[in-house]
C-alpha cells in the first residue's frame, strides 16, 4: 500500500505574465525556505478571449475592431508542507492583479 503524501496545489492566473512569474518565484522561494518541496511553476495553456465590435454605431458592417484578453495560468505543487510553510504562504504579499486558488 502506498503512502499518501500531503500536497498543496496553488493555481495562479493573471492577465500580465510578468506579474504572474514574479508571484510564482515568491511562492517557490517561500516553500524552499521552509524546507518544503516545490514543483513548478507548471504553465497551463493561455486562455484567449477575442471580441469583435462594430466600429460604426449605424451602418458599415465591414468596419470592425477586434479586442482580446489573454489569461495566463500556472500551477505550483508543494509537497510535505509544514505548519511553518502554510503560515509563511498566508503572510506572503502578492500583487492585486494575480488570482490565487489554493487546494489542500
UniProtKB/Swiss-Prot annotation:
GO molecular function, one term: tRNA binding
Xref: InterPro entries: Ribosomal_uS10 (IPR001848), Ribosomal_uS10_CS (IPR018268), Ribosomal_uS10_dom (IPR027486), Ribosomal_uS10_dom_sf (IPR036838)
A Pfam entry, by short name: Ribosomal_S10
Gene Ontology terms: cellular component: small ribosomal subunit
Keyword tags: Ribonucleoprotein, Ribosomal protein
GO process annotations (BP): translation
Family according to the record: Belongs to the universal ribosomal protein uS10 family.
Its job: Involved in the binding of tRNA to the ribosomes.
Quaternary structure, from the entry: Part of the 30S ribosomal subunit.
Protein name according to UniProt: Small ribosomal subunit protein uS10
Organism this protein belongs to: Gloeobacter violaceus (strain ATCC 29082 / PCC 7421)
The organism's taxonomic lineage, starting at the top: Bacteria, Bacillati, Cyanobacteriota, Cyanophyceae, Gloeobacterales
Amino acid at each position: 500500500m502506498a503512502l499518501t503524501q500531503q500536497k498543496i496545489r496553488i493555481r495562479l492566473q493573471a492577465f500580465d505574465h510578468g506579474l504572474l512569474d514574479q508571484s510564482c518565484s515568491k511562492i517557490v522561494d517561500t516553500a524552499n525556505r521552509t524546507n518544503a518541496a516545490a514543483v513548478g511553476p507548471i504553465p497551463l495553456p493561455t486562455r484567449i478571449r477575442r471580441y469583435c465590435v462594430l466600429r460604426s454605431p449605424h451602418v458599415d458592417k465591414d468596419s470592425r475592431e477586434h479586442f482580446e484578453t489573454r489569461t495566463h495560468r500556472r500551477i505550483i505543487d508543494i509537497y510535505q508542507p509544514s505548519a511553518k510553510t502554510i503560515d509563511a504562504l498566508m503572510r506572503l504579499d502578492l500583487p492585486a492583479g494575480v488570482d490565487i486558488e489554493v487546494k489542500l
